[in-house]
Each structure stands twice: as C-alpha cells, then as structure tokens.
Amino acid sequence: MEKTVQKQFVDLLEEHQNIVHKVCRLYTNSQDQHNDLFQEITIQLWKAFPKFRGEAKFSTWMYRVALNTAITLYRKSKRSIQTQDYDSVMFKISSEDYDDTVEQQLKLMYTKIKELNDIEKALVFLYLEDKNYREISDTLGITEVNARVKMNRVKGKLRKLLNP
C-alpha cells in the first residue's frame, strides 16, 4: 500500500489504541494474552483498513473489528481451555484515589462481566464506554431496539450475578 495510507492507518491506530487495549483487557486474563490479542486485532484492522469507507466514525468501525476479532479468538481459546483462573486477572484503573473497597467492587464487577457470553460482554463494554444505543447497534450490527432490549436483560443478569 502507499505510504500515505500506511501513515493514515498508523496515525488512526495511535489515536484510538485505547479502544483496542480496553477490548483486550475484557477478553484476556494475562499480559501475554493481552499482547497477543492486541497484535491480532492490529493485524485484522490493517487487513480491513482498505475496506473502511468512512460511513461510520473510525472509532465505531475499530470497535466492531476489535470486538469481532476478540470474540472469535476467545471462542477458539475457550474450546481448547475450559477453565480460566479469574484470580490472576489484574485490572488497571485509570483514575486516582480509589480506596480498596471501590477497587474490590470494580474487580468483582469485571470478574462477573467475564462470566457473560460474548455479545453480552461487548454490550456492557460499549455501555461502560458511554456509547449510546445507536452507536452500540452500529458497532454490533444489531438494531437499536435489539441493543436496548439486550442491554436491559444484561443489566438484570449482572444484578443477579453481583447480588446472589
């Protein structure tokens, strides 16, 4: 590809790499897995970049590619490894002044989110990213109404998981 296309891709990836890192955190349990998934998502983004038409925001398109790649790899790894060690999950919280109680609650919440199915995880992830239902539906390729219904069900499911 041309240097300008390559530079455009690298610039956009650098600008929005936090999206990929957040998806990686949600679907991996170790730094090595995180790095592998980040690399695989980057490869898939590069392969798909010529097809990006700009009809949606780049970040929306990036979410879609990243989530689809993560879900595909997660399903493959789930088939080969049935057990996962949730105690080894480390969450980096990007805010200051969290007391231990808040940190423990966040850790519990993310552990429970990891128990959701792939689509539910993606819904929660996008919801926590403050995406509106239109953006969620565009990213996941579902209708806006379906995104709302699924999100309400997932909220109820998470409530039950967090408060048995």
Q: What residues fall within each predicted segment?
A:
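A short, charge-rich alpha-helical start-of-domain segment used by transcription regulators
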Residues: 1-22, 35
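Amphipathic, Lys/Arg- and hydrophobic-enriched alpha-helical face
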Residues: 13-31, 48, 113
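Structural recognition of an alpha-helix C-terminal capping motif at a helix-to-coil junction
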Residues: 36-43, 47, 56-68
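Hydrophobic positions on the alpha-helical face of helix-turn-helix-like DNA-binding modules
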Residues: 41, 65, 123-124, 136-137, ...
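Arg/Lys-rich amphipathic alpha helix in sigma70-family domain 2
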Residues: 51, 64-84, 102, 153
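Internal acidic/polar
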Residues: 80-106, 132-133
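Short amphipathic alpha helix immediately N-terminal
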Residues: 115-135, 139
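DNA-recognition helix of helix-turn-helix
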Residues: 140-164
